């Protein structure tokens, strides 16, 4: 058997930044540091930060007065920000800048009273935070997950409308939804390019190439990672069996029966160390060759907050 590694794969700039913020806050201020929601959706990463003194909570009422709290890469609603300010919590914001960009689109629509339609997955923390940027009762924000949801909106075709998208969606599915929105609401406005981030786009394109060459695709990523799930779905959609795994412990040897080429990729929140542990485990199961696809180079870097950056330099 041989392995083909997707390229690019694994950590994106937003995830790198979010993890650095937690690690630097712990280094500078000491434990405990509270983090609202998993800073990124990866069990290995979260467990590592817990071991260093990070405490993960779902709501701010779990954070003691005067404590330091970090907002996860997925972003938070305005209500959460107001609550943190009211309680005088020290906040470091690890929201991905590309998510913040979508937040600003929603905030502008809210200020104008323009009704907004968000394409995304209900209940995902990024979606909850993004919808929470809208606070104008004269308008409203509405969520659609697929083309079928559009018929349920009940909005007038000539209304002043705008749309935006979650950053970690399936590119193909999102294009279909946007086209359906434009057909039903010809005057709807939106970004010139959808809001799906560069890392999601690049990793999905890499999986397309991988699925053409492999008989099985393994996606390293946690079950609650949106972008990791989309990678597994895309490989399957292209006709190549796929499995989403947290690490080598999840691999079932039965998956490998009759397989000569295994494709491996990783979601944007999965570290390379997990990919390499999967590779090493597969070598014990008969893999003799490992190669990597050519892919686009990613050089995007997002800086950490100034207070942490200054200390980091010193």
Swiss-Prot record:
Cofactor binding summary note: Binds 1 [4Fe-4S] cluster per subunit.
Pathway entry: Isoprenoid biosynthesis; dimethylallyl diphosphate biosynthesis; dimethylallyl diphosphate from (2E)-4-hydroxy-3-methylbutenyl diphosphate: step 1/1; Isoprenoid biosynthesis; isopentenyl diphosphate biosynthesis via DXP pathway; isopentenyl diphosphate from 1-deoxy-D-xylulose 5-phosphate: step 6/6
Cofactor: [4Fe-4S] cluster
GO MF entry, a single one: metal ion binding
Binding-site list for (2E)-4-hydroxy-3-methylbut-2-enyl diphosphate: 41, 74, 124, 167, 225-227, 269
This protein's record includes keyword Glycoprotein: no
Catalytic activity field: isopentenyl diphosphate + 2 oxidized [2Fe-2S]-[ferredoxin] + H2O = (2E)-4-hydroxy-3-methylbut-2-enyl diphosphate + 2 reduced [2Fe-2S]-[ferredoxin] + 2 H(+); dimethylallyl diphosphate + 2 oxidized [2Fe-2S]-[ferredoxin] + H2O = (2E)-4-hydroxy-3-methylbut-2-enyl diphosphate + 2 reduced [2Fe-2S]-[ferredoxin] + 2 H(+)
Active site location: 126
UniProt xrefs under Pfam families: LYTB
InterPro entries: LytB/IspH
Residues bound to isopentenyl diphosphate: 41, 74, 124, 225-227, 269
GO annotation, biological process: dimethylallyl diphosphate biosynthetic process; isopentenyl diphosphate biosynthetic process, methylerythritol 4-phosphate pathway; terpenoid biosynthetic process
Binding residues annotated for dimethylallyl diphosphate, in chain numbering: 41, 74, 124, 225-227, 269
Residues that coordinate or bind [4Fe-4S] cluster: 12, 96, 197
EC numbers: 1.17.7.4
Keyword terms: 4Fe-4S, Iron, Iron-sulfur, Isoprene biosynthesis, Metal-binding, Oxidoreductase
Family: Belongs to the IspH family.
Role according to the record: Catalyzes the conversion of 1-hydroxy-2-methyl-2-(E)-butenyl 4-diphosphate (HMBPP) into a mixture of isopentenyl diphosphate (IPP) and dimethylallyl diphosphate (DMAPP). Acts in the terminal step of the DOXP/MEP pathway for isoprenoid precursor biosynthesis.
Name of this chain's protein: 4-hydroxy-3-methylbut-2-enyl diphosphate reductase
Gene: ispH
């Amino acid at each position: 058997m041989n392995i083909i590694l997707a390229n690019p794969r694994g950590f994106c700039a937003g995830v790198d930044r979010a993890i650095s913020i937690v690690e630097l806050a712990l280094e500078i201020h000491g434990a405990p540091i509270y983090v609202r929601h998993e800073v990124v959706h990866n069990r290995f990463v979260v467990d590592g930060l817990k071991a260093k003194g990070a405490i993960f909570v779902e709501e701010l009422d779990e954070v003691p007065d005067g404590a330091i709290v970090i907002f996860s890469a997925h972003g938070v609603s305005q209500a959460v920000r107001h609550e943190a300010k009211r309680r005088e919590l020290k906040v470091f914001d690890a929201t991905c800048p590309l998510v913040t960009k979508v937040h600003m689109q929603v905030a502008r629509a809210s200020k104008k009273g323009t009704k907004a339609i968000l394409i995304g997955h209900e209940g995902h923390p990024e979606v909850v935070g993004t919808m929470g940027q809208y606070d104008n009762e004269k308008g409203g924000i509405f969520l659609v997950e697929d083309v079928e949801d559009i018929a349920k909106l009940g909005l007038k075709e000539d209304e002043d409308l705008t749309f935006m998208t979650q950053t970690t969606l399936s590119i193909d599915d999102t294009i279909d939804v946007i086209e359906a929105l434009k057909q039903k609401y010809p005057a709807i406005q939106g970004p010139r390019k959808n809001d799906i981030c560069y890392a999601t786009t690049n990793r999905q394109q890499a999986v397309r190439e991988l699925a053409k060459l492999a008989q099985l695709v393994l996606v390293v990523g946690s079950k609650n990672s949106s972008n990791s799930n989309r990678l597994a779905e895309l490989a399957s959609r292209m006709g190549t069996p796929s499995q989403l795994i947290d690490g080598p412990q999840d691999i079932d040897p039965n998956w490998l029966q009759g397989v000569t080429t295994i494709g491996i990729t990783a979601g944007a929140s999965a570290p390379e160390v997990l990919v390499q542990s999967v590779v090493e485990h597969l070598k014990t199961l008969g893999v003799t060759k490992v190669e990597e696809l050519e892919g686009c180079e990613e050089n995007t870097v997002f800086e950490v907050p100034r207070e942490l950056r200054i200390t980091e330099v010193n």
